[in-house]
Amino acid sequence: MSMPATSTKTTKLATSLIDEYALLGWRAMLTEVNLSPKPGLVDRINCGAHKDMALEDFHRSALAIQGWLPRFIEFGACSAEIAPEAVLHGLRPIGMACEGDMFRATAGVNTHKGSIFSLGLLCAAIGRLLQLNQPVTPTTVCSTAASFCRGLTDRELRTNNSQLTAGQRLYQQLGLTGARGEAEAGYPLVINHALPHYLTLLDQGLDPELALLDTLLLLMAINGDTNVASRGGEGGLRWLQREAQTLLQKGGIRTPADLDYLRQFDRECIERNLSPGGSADLLILTWFLAQI
């Protein structure tokens, strides 16, 4: 694996520490995809609303991405002395190379493109914080990642071009900023909602898988998921948010018996061809940040 040219600065970080964070990123991706049952998403039970990917694709993809996570951390450390707004430009070639390995591992299937963006940002933020001898906490990591993305939504979503990307179209039609907006804001859905919710459930003694499933429902209820909107429009997104909110209001996922509600929700998502991939990406970040 060749590393794109990124910086001439050297890092003082221990390889073991870098590898430890990279391993957490890999475990976060595996934890999410193996979590079952998940409405509309690939898991151990079925392929959700996806006909082009399976569980094994995600396992291969996560392994391919793990090899690149140290590069994001290293670049974050090596670029610690430059303005944060300039970091994203240097991260892009690493992300593109990582994406290439993902596609090679899955024979062209897009399993984790969103996670390459979000985990890459968080890993770079961790590298920067470590290099500057600053505390590595969920809040500092996400605020540092946000500083890398300052102005990103304006630059990439606000355009008058006739040839719009899917993200630009959803922004113009529905005002959804997707992964870019969440990153630029410092991942508030994770920091202010999903992470405290998940940690509270764990503190209450709830089984970790049930706690993650309940946290996924919370994310589905509040996230303007562009993956869902691109498949089902505004109506599909509002339906999914309402269904998730209804399950939470009924008590959420607290016992194995509650999994029947998720299985029914899964069947309905498959029938409507809806997959909350954006919320799945945020769940990966939630688990990852809970470990640091």
Curated annotation (Swiss-Prot):
One of its GO terms (biological process) is prosthetic group biosynthetic process. Its EC number is 2.4.2.52. Keywords: ATP-binding, Nucleotide-binding, Transferase. It catalyses: 3'-dephospho-CoA + ATP = 2'-(5''-triphospho-alpha-D-ribosyl)-3'-dephospho-CoA + adenine. GO terms for molecular function: ATP binding; triphosphoribosyl-dephospho-CoA synthase activity. It comes from the Bacteria. It is an enzyme of class 2 (transferase). The keyword GTP-binding does not apply. HAMAP family: CitG (MF_00397). PANTHER family: 2-(5''-TRIPHOSPHORIBOSYL)-3'-DEPHOSPHOCOENZYME-A SYNTHASE, TRIPHOSPHORIBOSYL-DEPHOSPHO-COA SYNTHASE. Belongs to the CitG/MdcB family. This is Probable 2-(5''-triphosphoribosyl)-3'-dephosphocoenzyme-A synthase. It comes from Shigella sonnei (strain Ss046). The gene is citG.
